[in-house]
Structures are given as structure tokens and as C-alpha cells.
Amino acid sequence: MTRVNQLPCDCVSTAEESLTSGTCITPTHVTSLSSPLDRSGDVDPLPVSDESGGSKADESMTDADETKKRKRILSGDCEADENNKSDGEIASLNDGVDAFTAICEDLNCSLCNQLPDRPVTILCGHNFCLKCFDKWIDQGNQICATCRSTIPDKMAANPRVNSSLVSVIRYVKVAKTAGVGTANFFPFTSNQDGPENAFRTKRAKIGEENAARIYVTVPFDHFGPIPAEHDPVRNQGVLVGESWENRVECRQWGVHLPHVSCIAGQEDYGAQSVVISGGYKDDEDHGEWFLYTGRSRGRHFANEDQEFEDLNEALRVSCEMGYPVRVVRSYKDRYSAYAPKEGVRYDGVYRIEKCWRKARFPDSFKVCRYLFVRCDNEPAPWNSDESGDRPRPLPNIPELETASDLFERKESPSWDFDEAEGRWRWMKPPPANHEQRERMKMAMTCLLLFVLIILVGSSSILYQY
């Protein structure tokens, strides 16, 4: 067997080209080793130059500034940067562009390669626009357009808009247009710690009603959004997109007060809020507008025709007067792509434009139907734009051709869009709440009694003469 002798090197090695033994402290030449040394985990040494030395010797620079300057020295752009812009401007500009580019590449729709509109995120993590996703599924494709992973049947039949991703897309759009900005991130509000819990004992925990504190100061029959002046806890009001774990916590913030009923209102006064939960297959939900089915009188009347009475009449009164109705979507809505994945979510105020009755099936009982159209100044949770709603034409409803008892508003609505101010507001005075109505009734009663006393006194005086 031939033995390979390691001949001594005839050149003087530098410190970087020698390796010191850990036992005998004998330097070994790296170039003389039989196999190259694995230095993948070592940190590359910085080149020694006058500029880098000056940067290191500058005690006024922080470690972060020193690291950024060394990176520019290695890239060879130091002189050009110093001639044009300052260190902080270059760093912030480069970081912003790199972050925006990286985020856009990760968020883009797998089909149109644009920032997704009403994004749908599948299990593999890739995103689609809701329209692109529906079109992709309608073409018979049930795999991801990027990684070819299988899309589950349940997700293909009922996609859900990723409202968490909407906030990120809003931030990206603001950063792209303005460079600096803040997006509306909506917190998941929970009321589970502290004495404000909705239960105290095991018996009360079943209903979660005992000692449930109401955080806002609006009356129970308040119409429209809940502004900041009625929020003494946070001083911001209830924002569009806020979520809660259940309807009890939603009630504590005054958005929808009934624990069970999906309609909050009074027959002779109007409806203040509705909850989209469960629903029927023919209840269309397109986000900015949806079709809503009325409420039966009870379990024993489920197979009878619905009438415009009780809570159904409250919805019709809101349609007639043009009142804003708060809308809450629940995760229990199985047929909507705009329902949250968990809990309940406040989606803003809508206006009822039309209501009618129709038979759900041939020779079946009639139900009350309502057309809700969004009219809020805040953007919807699924909309990546920063602006609110604008007046839009009413959608075409095919079922109106066979509908009966169609009701449409004839007068101008109380809640309407002000072109001069560019926002939705009360164009007519809002309706008086229950306490104000009771005071008015009491005042009218006292006035009538006073007039009656005067008339009786006058008649008695005339009778004496």
C-alpha cells in the first residue's frame, strides 16, 4: 500500500490559514489537510478597510447602525448612499420595499397573482380571491393552483373569507400608497376575567346571564352604530369587525341584546339588530347585501304562513322608515362565505330596502323575506379597502317575480348618504328611545289632566251662574 507523505509547506501561512490543535496547541496548515475543513457555521470576517474601521471606532453609532453600515460596505453602495441620502432614510426605505415585496409575494392570489379581494385561505396556506376560488371550483378543479394539494370537499362547497388576512392586506395597501400608515386591526374582545364575568355560580353558568355587565351606555332600543361617547370603558365605540366568543359577550357591548332571538326590535317601533345564524339554503349572502328570512311565531306555528307581525313587523317598520340595522354574523351560518370561523362578529349597519312574502316551495307555507343592503362608513371586515360604503344600485332578485305582499319604501330614508359630507348619517332625527317616549307620554298625560281640570272648573263656575 502506498503511503502518502505530508510534505511541509514552503510558504509562511497567515493566522487564518492555520488551525491550532486543542490538545498540544500545535498549528496545522489548513491547506495541508487531506479533506477541506467544513466552515459552514463560521461567520464570514468583515473586510478590513478604513471606512469599516472608522464605523467601528465611532462610539456614537449604535450596534444596529453599525451592522447596517457594514452591510452597505460589503455591497459596495456606501459611497453612493452617503452622497444621496442619510443612513436612516436608506435603511427605512430598503426595509420597507423589501418587506412590502416579500409580503405581496406571499399574499397574492394563486390565480390572478394580485392581492386577493375577499381572500380565501386553503389548508396548504395559499390564498385565492373569493371570485377566483369559485370560478376555479366551478371548472372542476379541486386542487391548489400553486402546490396541487387537494382542497377538501367541505371547503370547496362553502369557502370562508379570511378576515384576519384582510387586515394585513389593508396594511400592505397603505404602505404601498403612503409609505407610512396604520390599518384598522380589530381585536377579539373577551370579558372573562374580573368581576364583569357573565356568571358567578355553576347554576348561573348554564345561562351565563347572572351579573352580566353592559359596557356601553346606549338604551336597549338604540338604532345605528354605537359611537365613542357611549363607550366609557374604551372610549372608541364598537368597531366594525369586532368579535366575541358568544352572543352573551356580544350583548354586553350592546350590539345585539337578545340571547336567543335573532331579531331585536319592537313591533310598533322598528328593529335595531339581527343575527345571521343557521339560516336556510335560499338565504343568499353576498357580503354587501343579503336575503333574510323572517321569524315564525313559535314551534307550533312552524308549518303556517308567516305574517308581518311581532318581530317581522318590526323589520318592516325599519324598512319603511329607512332605519339602520346592526348586523351580526355567527359562525353557525353554514351557507355563507362571509361568516366568521368562530364566535360572532359585528359587520356594520345595513338598511332594509324591500320586504315581501313568498312560498319557499310550491304548495308550501309562505315566509317573510327582507333585502338588506350595507350602508356603513367603516369598511366591511372582508373588504381590503380603507373606505366605507357608497350608495349602490339594488341587486336583481329573481324571486320577486313570484312574490306577494311586496313592500318598498316610498319616502326618503332616515339614514342616508350625505353627498356634501361624503358619509352616512341621520338625515332625519333618529326615533326617540323608550325612556324618551315614556317621558313624552307622561307629559302628555299631565297636560290632558291639567286641561281636563280647567274645563271641569270652568263648567262648574258657569253652572253656578
From Swiss-Prot:
It is a single-pass membrane protein. It catalyses: S-ubiquitinyl-[E2 ubiquitin-conjugating enzyme]-L-cysteine + [acceptor protein]-L-lysine = [E2 ubiquitin-conjugating enzyme]-L-cysteine + N(6)-ubiquitinyl-[acceptor protein]-L-lysine. InterPro entries: PUA-like_sf (IPR015947), RING-HC_ORTHRUS_rpt1 (IPR047498), SRA-YDG_sf (IPR036987), SRA_YDG (IPR003105), UHRF1/2-like (IPR045134), Znf_C3HC4_RING-type (IPR018957), Znf_RING (IPR001841), Znf_RING/FYVE/PHD (IPR013083). Gene3D superfamilies: SRA-YDG (2.30.280.10), Zinc/RING finger domain, C3HC4 (zinc finger) (3.30.40.10). A zinc finger (RING-type) spans 109-148. It comes from the Eukaryota. Residues 233-374 form the YDG domain. It is found in: Nucleus; Membrane. GO terms for cellular component: cytoplasm; membrane; nucleus. Keywords: Chromatin regulator, DNA-binding, Membrane, Metal-binding, Nucleus, Transferase, Transmembrane, Transmembrane helix, Ubl conjugation pathway, Zinc, Zinc-finger. GO terms for biological process: chromatin organization; protein ubiquitination. GO terms for molecular function: histone binding; methyl-CpG binding; methyl-CpNpG binding; methyl-CpNpN binding; ubiquitin-protein transferase activity; zinc ion binding. Its EC number is 2.3.2.27. The chain crosses the membrane at residues 442-462. The RING fingers are required for ubiquitin ligase activity. This is E3 ubiquitin-protein ligase ORTHRUS-LIKE 1. It comes from Arabidopsis thaliana.
